[in-house]
Amino acid sequence: MRKRIAIIVNEVSTLLHFRKELVKDLVKEQYEVFCIAEGYSSQTKDIIRSWGAEPVEHNLKRSNLNPLNDLVQVFKIRKKLKQISPDIVLTCFVKPVIFASISAKLAGVKRIVGMIEGLGYAFTPSPTPKGFKSKLIKFLQIFLYKISLPTLDKVLFLNPDDKSELLEKHNIYVKDSEVIGGIGVNLDDYFYTEQNISDNVSFIFLGRLLKEKGIFEFLSAARKVKEKYSQTKFFILGQIDKQNPTAMSEEMLQTYIDDEIIIYPGYVTNVQEYIVKSNVFVLPSYREGVPKSTQEAMAMGKVILTTDVPGCKETVVDGLNGFIVPVFSTHELAEKMIYLIENKSELVQMGYNSRKIAENKFNVRNINKKIISILDE
């Protein structure tokens, strides 16, 4: 008889971008897979079904801070799980790990695994002091983790810093835990292309245009570099999240476009075409799980510039496939950009090294085998 597994994430977009390969591999291994998420459309339901899985809706909204609504959703998800009757539940990201794990326990699910893919904004450092709201959210998050994590049979982390900070620093008991080192990348989809150094060096930032992603450091460094090397290209791909308080403004973005510091095509679906055009992938983030975008850029043979913070530092061997710079440091980021411009002959080998690290460390097939074996323990 086929085993049933329910994968619970926050939003459908998360499933599409981060769980596709795992769902497909589970289906290949003859699991009956149910994908539980918020925000389905008829089109996204069809996509999930095309993978061989069954879409199921929940209403546990990622940004909702209403504890009463979250409590109601715990019991609604429990009801759905009782109907599905899965052998295994995998919860992913902050809210599902906290609330849906409790739902699974109340539903009597035999094996429950939680995957914490970064600790989130509450645990992310900031160049300026955080306000009362951020501190309160962190306090509540830790309190809720202390309730939910002991209900899990195993907790998975992407990097060792997240594990030590959450479990050891805050003294949270778990039955079992493991660091899996990233969710991986499909090496066939993200193919290697040798660096083109016949033209001017180009840099790319890919992600939401938020303070904690390092967008302001990227922009400031780009302006500094353009003062010395005006022909350098800086691409930015990503949307402004207008509902996020740390998002950059449209006015600021437009200033950099008007000043010809950056090239901004906005949100695009052909991301790989822009990565191919670029030499260096830049993510000056303040904290990550292990960024999938960086793994994809590595697979495509890009040099990586990133920060010395949890999650980001897992993607670079300093000087081998890129450079690690101090977090918040526009000056050092610009210096490394200039170094790569002035020593662009090094880009070919560094890009090749990125691909090799991706093959050895971030092959999604190997990582999924590990995850599936953990789920089936």
For the regions a language model picked out, list residue spans one by one.
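Aromatic "clamp/platform" in nucleotide-sugar-dependent glycosyltransferases that forms part
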Residues: 267, 286
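A short, well-ordered alpha-helix in the C-terminal region of glycosyltransferases
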Residues: 332, 339, 346-361, 367-373
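A conserved mid-protein helix/loop that constitutes part of the nucleotide-sugar donor-binding site
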Residues: 16-21, 201, 205, 210-224, ...
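Short hydrophobic beta-strand element within catalytic cores of glycosyltransferases
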Residues: 303-306, 316
